[in-house]
Structures are given as structure tokens and as C-alpha cells.
């Protein structure tokens, strides 16, 4: 039952991240600030709340033990956390905290999005330089290649796990560099800045 409702809620909310990335592209591309100013303003605004909340989430299992609460409390919040978290060990919590620069832990899985967001912010000044100079046709070609890349997981699932140069020792196939959330950035920018008037569309 947990898996069913988790899948139901997840499917309903799944579009939120791509939509947010599209809004980011619509509002920020092309960048108006200098690269150093942009990094200081955007990344610092995200980094410190992310770090504080990640630490608190990873300390949560240990804090429940400190308060004398049952490990079942942890499973109520994090059903997939497993036996390691249920030990309520400070050592395990500290190990999770030490691994924050590398990845999220089993108790702060939802923080995956912040790693994505920081990566997009690091990438934006470089992408912005291209967006500012690129023609509409070039942007449409990028979006077409990116759109095809979004269909590849279905190909992997139902046809073959490898295509266009991909194999067991090379995951960088032909459209690899068009794939990912950068397409949502450009799509948001394009939808906002394209002339959608009826006359323009008919022409």
C-alpha cells in the first residue's frame, strides 16, 4: 500500500521539477549579471539552507534515539531507510553528514533536486553565452535533439539497453550531451521569448 500511494503521489508531483527548471530558464536566460556576481547571489542562496537541512535530516535518526523514541518512528517518516538507520547511531548520522558533498543519504533523498539545481547554476553562465548568440533555428534544433533524448529511456526499456554508440563500457551515446535538464532551461527560455501571436504562428 505504501508503494502504491508513493507511486500515485510521485506521479502527480513528478512534473514539478521540470516545470521549476523551465521557470528558471524563462527568468534567468540569458544572464544579466556577471558570472561571479551570479554565482555569489544564486549558489550561496541555495547552499546554506541546503546544508543546514541536510545536516538536520541526517541527525534525525540519532535524535530519535536520544529522545528515547522507538526506531519505528524513523520508519514512519522514512519507510525505505533500512536497518542501518534504525540503529539510531551518532556514528552513522555523522557518516551521512560527511558524505553530503558527494550525495544525499537514505533519509534526505528529496535533496537530490538541490544537487541538480546547484549544477544548473554552475552551468548557466556557460549555457547563457550560447543562448544569447544562438538563432531561433539553432535553439529549435537543440530542443529537437533534446526531445529525442528524452524518449531514449523507453527505447532502453522496451527495445535495447544500448543505442547510438552506447554500450556496457560507454554510456556517452550520440545524444548524451543534449540530454538532461538543460533542455528544460532552454524550453522555458524559448516559450517565454518566442512570438506566439496568431499572425506569427500562421506565417
Predicted features along the sequence, with ranges:
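Transmembrane-helix boundary and interhelical linker motifs in polytopic inner-membrane proteins
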Residues: 29-40
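Hydrophobic alpha-helical segments with transmembrane-like composition
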Residues: 20, 29-30, 60-66, 78-159, ...
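Alpha-helical transmembrane segments and terminal signal-anchor/GPI-anchor hydrophobic tails
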Residues: 197-203
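Membrane-interface interhelical loops and short amphipathic "cap" helices
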Residues: 1-4, 161-170
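Active-site helix-to-loop segments that bind/position phosphate- or nucleotide-bearing substrates
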Residues: 43
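N-terminal low-complexity, intrinsically disordered segments
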Residues: 68-70, 203
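Extracytoplasmic catalytic-loop and juxtamembrane helix elements of membrane-embedded
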Residues: 71-81, 164
Amino acid at each position: 500500500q505504501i508503494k502504491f500511494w508513493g507511486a500515485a503521489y510521485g506521479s502527480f508531483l513528478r512534473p514539478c521539477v521540470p516545470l521549476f527548471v523551465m521557470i528558471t530558464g524563462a527568468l534567468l536566460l540569458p544572464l544579466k549579471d556577471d558570472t561571479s556576481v551570479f554565482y555569489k547571489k544564486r549558489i550561496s542562496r541555495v547552499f546554506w539552507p541546503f546544508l543546514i537541512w541536510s545536516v538536520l535530516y541526517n541527525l534525525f535518526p540519532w535524535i530519535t534515539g536520544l529522545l528515547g523514541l522507538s526506531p519505528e518512528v524513523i520508519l514512519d517518516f522514512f519507510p525505505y531507510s533500512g536497518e542501518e538507520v534504525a540503529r539510531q547511531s551518532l556514528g552513522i548520522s555523522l557518516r551521512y553528514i560527511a558524505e553530503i558533498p558527494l550525495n544525499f543519504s537514505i533519509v534526505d533523498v528529496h535533496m537530490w533536486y538541490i544537487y541538480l539545481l546547484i549544477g544548473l547554476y554552475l552551468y548557466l553562465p556557460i549555457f547563457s553565452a550560447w543562448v544569447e548568440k544562438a538563432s531561433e533555428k539553432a535553439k529549435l534544433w537543440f530542443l529537437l535533439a533534446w526531445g529525442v533524448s528524452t524518449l531514449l529511456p523507453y527505447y532502453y526499456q522496451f527495445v535495447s539497453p544500448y543505442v547510438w554508440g552506447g554500450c556496457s563500457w560507454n554510456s556517452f551515446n550520440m545524444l548524451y550531451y543534449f540530454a538532461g535538464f538543460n533542455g528544460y532551461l532552454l524550453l522555458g527560455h524559448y516559450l517565454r521569448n518566442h512570438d506566439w501571436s496568431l499572425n506569427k504562428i500562421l506565417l
